[in-house]
């Protein structure tokens, strides 16, 4: 019969490898999302008007910078401070709760982006849907402000609730398979319930994201059938916009599902089985997903692609000037 072996501590090599991967993921995630933020924020500094999609991308990049920072702090806690043979310390629990709130804000922003794509790309025929699409386009800034405000309120409430309750420990010994002991801490139970509650609140934005993405998929299929009947031109701006939007949404869906599965698996690994290597693998997967979607967003956004091209050309010209300068100095010598 298969039994789960609890791994409270790991070797120095495993910890070093995990920390190296975490630093690499943090660097890549920070650079990609900071790039998206700086490109859009530079337009704000120059007092150029931002489009609705750029506003959403600006907020999305900020939330993901927080996500990467919290996941990196979680990695440091796992490698240096948190011993899984002991109850979870307060700082590690606070990091987990803040990550849950940031992840929920990230999902709401993705739902806003999906709604925005629907309002811009789908040609509605029903009067109510036309009015709704127009309302979404006009109220996107208020929606973003509401998401930021709700995230801040949730953060304050969760932190206050977490640090105000008495931190007493009651240990219950459970027997499994006649020889396996699990020390279930009340603090860990509270964290588990907070995790479930936060993910229940993630259901509405996730359903909103699925419905709007489904409508965009149906609109793309209808548009492709119309093109086959009325035109033979393979290059259509509306078709290309549909495909780029769907690439962004489908990639977010895939990365979000993978990250959510890793988060769900990490909870019993952390609280029940105390498997440190398993938790490290889950944290690594969760840290890789926001970076992957940021790369997809950069590749599908014309302004961000132009900024990448400009940076690459500047770097290439700088290297060429430096090489020419070295060649001239050697000639003079």
Curated annotation (Swiss-Prot):
Keyword line: G-protein coupled receptor, Glycoprotein, Membrane, Receptor, Sensory transduction, Taste, Transducer, Transmembrane, Transmembrane helix
A GO term from the CC aspect: membrane
GO molecular function: bitter taste receptor activity; G protein-coupled receptor activity
Major subcellular location class: membrane
Membrane topology category: Multi-pass membrane protein
SUPFAM superfamilies, sorted: Family A G protein-coupled receptor-like
Note: Most taste cells may be activated by a limited number of bitter compounds; individual taste cells can discriminate among bitter stimuli.
Regions that span the bilayer: 18-38, 56-76, 95-115, 143-163, 191-211, 252-272, 277-297
Biological process according to GO: detection of chemical stimulus involved in sensory perception of bitter taste
Official protein name in the record: Taste receptor type 2 member 38
Membrane-side (Extracellular) residue stretches: 1-17, 77-94, 164-190, 273-276
